[in-house]
């Protein structure tokens, strides 16, 4: 079976160095806010190209902390609108609603799966204060058009970089293209920890200090609390693991790109829509294909020993937690959620495994996909 994702194989690529790093933390006796955290924050900020990196508990917390900090700094207020892509993973939207802000859902571009820049400006109202772009599936969502819209209307530009570690726009990394960015280091990500972890990156000194305080119970100084904060801190073990894996991120991403290139060149099936390959601008956290009968294709691949996943089966505006949005008409979002299927793509995959995946997708037809 070619699993969609095998975290044991992923970790084994750097197992010796990870074990050494973890042992160092365990033997050192400092498990929070120690050298490993400071070193990772320094290394990741330098890699991304920002002055600040603040480690936190997870990617959702990273986005939530950014928005909360902007509220504390007076840049946002309860009820303000934040434009977000309608087809994102729900965490991007949860961060907005948790801060009592109003998400404005904008349709994606069907070829890139990222927010359609041509639709942003018409969604702006007098209450709009920010645009949250999501580098979905590993592809850069930033465009000069989006940046110009934000400048013209005085809007914050926030990045959700949970799925695009190492992705670039020109010479700059995603995570350094807007005013601030949230990062997730969930184990399955291109840069993944051995548990939950996240980070905020920014060049804004005031924002960085406020995020760091809110994530530490609201405290800049021990036992002195400036805000009603929360506990969202990266632990020393995760920081040490991430510091090891960061050294190999570009190499691992290149392997992802090579596999994606192989799929793009060797999958030939008129029933399957392959992702666009514009300027090789994705780090391929996910390789998304679309098929009218996605379930039949998934069954066919499983019969061939290939596991797939769906990202994501239910659109945010169709979820029970956002029942008030169920009336919204978002046909492109709904099409993507009805048709998307993710193929195995990870840096540990062998050439033979990639060949089997491409061959099986190419062989699919409605008749063989509907076998019991």
Residue positions per predicted region:
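Active-site phosphate-binding strand-loop segment of PLP-dependent enzymes
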Residues: 111-193, 199-201, 342
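N-terminal "arm"/small-domain region of PLP-dependent enzymes with the aminotransferase-like
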Residues: 1-30, 35, 304, 344
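PLP-dependent aminotransferase class I/II
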Residues: 37-42, 47-53, 60, 118, ...
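Conserved PLP-anchoring active-site segment centered on the Schiff-base-forming lysine
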Residues: 67-124, 130
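Helix C-cap/helix->beta junction micro-motif
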Residues: 99, 152-153, 304
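Pyridoxal 5′-phosphate
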Residues: 16, 76, 256
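Phosphate-binding glycine-rich loop
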Residues: 30, 35-81, 95-99, 105
């Amino acid at each position: 079976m070619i699993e969609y994702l095998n975290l044991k194989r992923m970790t084994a690529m750097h197992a010796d160095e990870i074990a050494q790093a973890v042992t160092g933390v365990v033997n050192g006796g400092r498990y929070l806010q120690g050298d490993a955290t400071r070193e990772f924050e320094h290394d990741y900020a330098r890699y991304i190209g920002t002055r600040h990196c603040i480690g936190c508990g997870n990617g959702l917390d990273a986005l939530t902390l950014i928005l909360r900090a902007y509220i504390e700094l007076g840049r946002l207020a309860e009820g303000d609108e934040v434009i977000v892509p309608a087809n994102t993973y729900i965490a991007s939207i949860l961060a907005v609603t948790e801060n009592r802000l109003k998400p404005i859902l904008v349709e994606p571009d069907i070829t890139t799966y990222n927010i359609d820049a041509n639709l942003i400006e018409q969604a702006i109202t007098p209450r709009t204060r920010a645009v949250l772009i999501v580098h979905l599936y590993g592809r850069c969502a930033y465009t000069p058009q989006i940046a110009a819209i934000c400048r013209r209307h005085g809007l914050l530009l926030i990045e959700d970089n949970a799925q695009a570690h190492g992705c670039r726009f020109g010479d700059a990394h995603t995570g350094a293209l807007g005013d601030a960015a949230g990062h997730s280091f969930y184990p399955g990500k291109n840069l993944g920890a051995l548990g939950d972890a996240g980070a905020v990156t920014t060049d804004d000194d005031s924002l960085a200090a406020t995020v760091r305080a809110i994530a530490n119970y609201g405290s800049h100084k021990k036992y002195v609390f400036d805000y009603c904060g929360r506990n969202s801190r990266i632990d020393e073990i995760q920081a040490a693991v991430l510091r090891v894996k960061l050294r190999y991120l570009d190499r691992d991403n290149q392997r992802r790109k090579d596999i994606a290139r192989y799929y793009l060149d060797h999958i030939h099936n008129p029933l399957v829509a392959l992702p666009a390959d514009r300027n090789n601008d994705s780090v391929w956290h996910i390789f998304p294909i679309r098929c009218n009968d996605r379930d039949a294709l998934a069954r066919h691949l499983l019969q061939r020993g290939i596991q797939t996943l769906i990202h994501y089966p239910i659109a945010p505006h169709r979820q029970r937690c956002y029942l008030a949005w169920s009336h919204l008409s978002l046909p492109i979002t709904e099409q993507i959620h009805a048709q998307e299927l993710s193929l195995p793509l990870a840096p540990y995959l062998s050439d033979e495994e990639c060949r089997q995946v491409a061959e099986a997708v190419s062989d699919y037809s409605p008749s063989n996909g509907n076998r019991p």
